[in-house]
Amino acid sequence: MIQTFNELGALRGQIAEWKREGLRVALVPTMGNLHGGHHSLVTLARQYADKVVASIFVNPTQFGPNEDFSRYPRTPEADVAGLEQAGCDAVWLPSVEAMYPLGVDKTTRMHAPGVSEVLEGASRPGHFDGVCTVVARLFLQVQPDAAVFGRKDYQQLAVIKQMVAELSFPIQIVGADIVRDDDGLAKSSRNQYLSAEQRPVATSIHRTLLGMREGYVAGQSRAQIEADATAALQADGFQVDYAVLRTPELAEPTFDGGGRVALIAARLGTTRLIDNLEF
């Protein structure tokens, strides 16, 4: 039976007991409102550890001034049930007061320069500072041997890898493949905001990513690939934040050849969707 913890001392006691037994612990950080993509992170975490701890915390420091923290769906009972079915051993459910004892406005914040300041960082200033701040605290609280993050949030994964390397956290960071519906739409908590009419239109993001890959393989210029992708999304009714081709390190490519990642962020109505494709 899955264990739930609301108090840090009790969680640390259980983790210490596991570690005395020589067991490896993996962490799966989440903000709740979980779906099959999140459950796949737990399944993957089991390959890297003997015990899996998931955290559920809607983090106020990663919400911008125009992003409604209070409206983010909170479904803890369903989330815990789903995590148990996925094979999770424990769930950490901290309060805002426990995570930020000095208050959100006065808390010490983390910043990962460079990679956190482009793309999502440019569209959502301060977002990755909030992500780094909460993830660093979760690492210190849980002290996992491994932590699993979805590749759907490609830039977030890159930011966390940079923070872990620079601060020498002794934690293995694992990226989990994107989980998609049968029509290609990446699973996301935001998909529930799409109307019945918008839902089939949203699949054009994945088709556009595939088109960007085809353009790259065919030798098209980066400028042409990005322009065509933006035009295709706009034709389907999207407001495009970015549709870009980058190196795996999220730098602008300066030469042909090598791996690439295509990244898209676009708004359909009021719903902002992100996706990416590595090739």
UniProtKB/Swiss-Prot annotation:
On the tree of life, the source organism's domain of life is Bacteria
Q: Where does beta-alanine bind?
A: Q62
Q: Which GO terms describe its molecular function?
A: ATP binding; pantoate-beta-alanine ligase activity
Positions with a binding annotation for (R)-pantoate? Q62, Q156
Presence of keyword Nucleotide-binding: yes
What does the record list as GO biological process? pantothenate biosynthetic process
Reported function: Catalyzes the condensation of pantoate with beta-alanine in an ATP-dependent reaction via a pantoyl-adenylate intermediate.
Top-level EC class, please? Answer: ligase
Describe its partners and assembly state.
Answer: Homodimer.
Binding of ATP, residues: 31-38, 150-153, 179, 187-190
Disulfide bond annotation, renumbered to this chain: none
Instruction: Supply the HAMAP family for this chain.
Output: PanC
Cite the EC number: 6.3.2.1
Name the active site residues.
Answer: H38
The entry assigns this protein to a family as follows: Belongs to the pantothenate synthetase family.
Localisation per UniProt entry: Cytoplasm
Q: Which organism does this sequence originate in?
A: Stenotrophomonas maltophilia (strain R551-3)
The UniProt entry, under InterPro entries, shows: Pantoate_ligase (IPR003721), Pantoate_ligase_C (IPR042176), Rossmann-like_a/b/a_fold (IPR014729)
Q: Which GO terms describe its cellular component?
A: cytosol
Q: What is the protein name for this chain?
A: Pantothenate synthetase
PANTHER family listed in its UniProt record: CYTIDYLATE KINASE/PANTOATE-BETA-ALANINE LIGASE, PANTOATE--BETA-ALANINE LIGASE
UniProt keywords, alphabetically: ATP-binding, Cytoplasm, Ligase, Nucleotide-binding, Pantothenate biosynthesis
Principal subcellular localization: cytoplasm
